[in-house]
Curated annotation (Swiss-Prot):
<feature type="domain" description="GRAS">
    <location>
        <begin position="113"/>
        <end position="485"/>
    </location>
</feature>
<feature type="compositionally biased region" description="Low complexity">
    <location>
        <begin position="10"/>
        <end position="24"/>
    </location>
</feature>
<comment type="similarity">
    <text>Belongs to the GRAS family.</text>
</comment>
<keyword id="KW-0805">Transcription regulation</keyword>
<feature type="region of interest" description="VHIID">
    <location>
        <begin position="198"/>
        <end position="266"/>
    </location>
</feature>
<keyword id="KW-0539">Nucleus</keyword>
<feature type="region of interest" description="Leucine repeat II (LRII)">
    <location>
        <begin position="278"/>
        <end position="310"/>
    </location>
</feature>
<comment type="function">
    <text>Probable transcription factor involved in plant development.</text>
</comment>
<dbReference type="GO" id="GO:0003700">
    <property type="term" value="F:DNA-binding transcription factor activity"/>
</dbReference>
<dbReference type="Pfam" id="PF03514">
    <property type="entry name" value="GRAS"/>
</dbReference>
<dbReference type="InterPro" id="IPR005202">
    <property type="entry name" value="TF_GRAS"/>
</dbReference>
<dbReference type="GO" id="GO:0006355">
    <property type="term" value="P:regulation of DNA-templated transcription"/>
</dbReference>
<feature type="region of interest" description="SAW">
    <location>
        <begin position="413"/>
        <end position="485"/>
    </location>
</feature>
<dbReference type="GO" id="GO:0005634">
    <property type="term" value="C:nucleus"/>
</dbReference>
<dbReference type="GO" id="GO:0030154">
    <property type="term" value="P:cell differentiation"/>
</dbReference>
<feature type="region of interest" description="PFYRE">
    <location>
        <begin position="320"/>
        <end position="410"/>
    </location>
</feature>
<feature type="region of interest" description="Disordered">
    <location>
        <begin position="1"/>
        <end position="28"/>
    </location>
</feature>
């Protein structure tokens, strides 16, 4: 439901107004890399749970009004600075990298001699497990998986071997039901490790930055009209730790005569209570530094599943932008209903960022096909990671454990749960609902090319495909960003 617009109180005047022509000549360091400064977004977080600020250990309340989460927090200005480098001592055992995992299984990163380097025939056993799951022969799947456990004991070796290990673990979690445990809030240590992993990933690979900058540019392109409302509302279905909004705030501030107003509604999982407090605190502080008016609200995923877009507060006069990724489609029972409900919101633009290979695998209805496609996709991601980081680099292992492994687990669980039900791909659902793709601007191309030039990792290149701007690794799409309009 939309409510009448009320002009938010203007707390400040805009510092500078920079036209789009000048911005095209910004250097790479000024325009692109400056925007993902994790040090300015996240303060240093200690590994010890007891070191967490009291404000982040407090309760977490929900209200019925607008179905939003209102995190309780207080700004702690005494948090020390974020570390620039991960030290090996931070992860002295495999339990640090794989929380809750039994130490006797030998899944630590140090078990390098346990990997079968004689060939890749372990893939055959992996596919046998998939075939057993697809035919509902779950006991036989367990037998084959137990044999596979003896051959793939740690995520070491070549990219395909490491990917096979993560996919084998995901299959094991699905078969045992361990991925269906009751909701558990993330521990302070887990949050710290994830933040560090994301920061380091952004530092060595162009993949995260490509996702953020292309999405932000698609949003900015939709707001470039002279008649645009100064009030921008972004509905984000995968906000993460919110670092991408630093870039967006900078651009809105520079391009808006009035300083701009940004409102974000993030749909988040139930276990992300602590993360939402961090996101709100840091983005609010950053907005104050940028002198931009800013609001952020959170809606529980469970609430959205029940109420759809009625769970979100919309205000008349705002320009609504919806930012989505495959994550939302994994949670919902069907893509078609989501898109039909989205149509009623009448967003200015819908930005879809696919960094999980969904463009090519979703909707097949075949668990085997989706599994093999996902295995190939993440093998390519790991290969690109190897090219960006030196062999044996600890940062690479942390990125795999805290960024890529959860994505693999979620992809396998979704494909397994839907193995008997084919459905439209997201693109088919968009087109069926009357959505049409919008060409991304040349400036988005410019940013992407500059990013690759800065990263200097050979093998990446930028391409265009069916209206998408695509980051490729040796011809295989790793990230595809597209903008759509009803």
């Amino acid at each position: 439901m939309k409510i009448p617009a009320s002009s938010p109180q203007d707390t400040t005047n805009n510092n500078n107004n920079t036209n789009s022509t000048d911005s095209n000549h910004l250097s790479m360091d000024e325009h692109v890399m400056r925007s993902m400064d994790w040090d300015s977004i996240m303060k240093e977080l200690e590994l010890d749970d007891d070191s967490a600020p009291n404000s982040l250990k407090t309760g977490f309340t929900t209200t019925t009004t607008d179905s939003t989460i209102l995190p309780l927090y207080a700004v702690d200005s005494n948090l020390p600075g974020f570390p620039d480098q991960i030290q090996p001592s931070d992860f002295e055992s495999s339990s640090d990298v794989y929380p809750g995992q039994n130490q006797t299984t030998g899944y630590g990163f140090n078990s390098l001699d346990s990997v079968d380097n004689g060939g890749f025939d372990f893939i055959e056993d992996l596919i046998r497990v998939v075939d057993c799951v697809e035919s509902d022969e779950l006991q036989l799947a367990q037998v084959v998986l137990s044999r596979l456990n003896q051959r793939l004991r740690s995520p070491a070796g070549r990219p395909l071997q490491r990917a096979a290990f993560y996919f084998k673990e995901a299959l094991g979690s699905f078969l045992t039901g361990s991925n269906r445990n009751p909701i558990r809030l993330s521990s302070w240590s887990e949050i710290v490790q994830r933040i560090r992993a994301i920061k380091e990933y952004s530092g060595i690979s162009p993949i995260p930055l490509f996702s953020h900058f292309t999405a932000n540019q698609a949003i900015l392109d939709s707001l470039s009209s002279q008649s645009s409302s100064p009030f921008v509302h972004v509905v984000d279905f995968e906000i993460g730790f919110g670092g991408q909004y630093a870039s967006l705030m900078r651009e809105i501030t520079e391009k808006s005569v009035s300083g701009g107003f940004l409102r974000v509604t993030a749909v988040v999982a139930e276990e992300c209570a602590v993360e939402t407090r961090l996101v709100k605190e840091n983005l609010t502080q950053f907005a104050a530094e940028m002198k931009i008016r800013f609001q952020i609200e959170f809606v529980l995923m469970k609430t959205f599943e029940m109420l759809s877009f009625k769970a979100i507060r919309f205000v008349e006069g705002e320009r609504t932008v919806v930012l989505i990724s495959p994550a939302i489609f994994r949670r919902l029972s069907g893509i078609t209903d989501f898109v039909n409900n989205l149509r009623r919101v009448s967003p200015k633009v819908v930005v879809f960022v696919d960094s999980e290979g969904w463009t090519e695998i979703a909707g097949s209805g075949s668990f085997r096909r989706e599994f093999v496609s996902a295995l190939e996709f993440y093998t390519m991601v790991l290969e690109s990671l190897d090219a960006a980081a030196p062999p044996g680099d600890l940062v690479k292992k942390i990125v795999e454990a805290f960024v890529l492994r959860p994505k693999i687990s979620a992809a396998v669980e979704t494909a397994a749960d839907r193995r008997h039900t084919g459905e439209m791909t997201w693109r088919e659902a968009f087109c069926a609902a009357g959505m049409r793709p919008i060409q991304l601007s040349q400036f988005a191309d410019f940013q992407a090319e500059c990013l690759l030039e800065k990263a200097q990792v050979r093998g990446f290149h930028v391409a265009k495909r069916q209206g998408e701007l695509v980051l490729c690794w040796h011809g295989r799409a790793l990230v595809a960003t597209s903008a759509w309009r009803f």
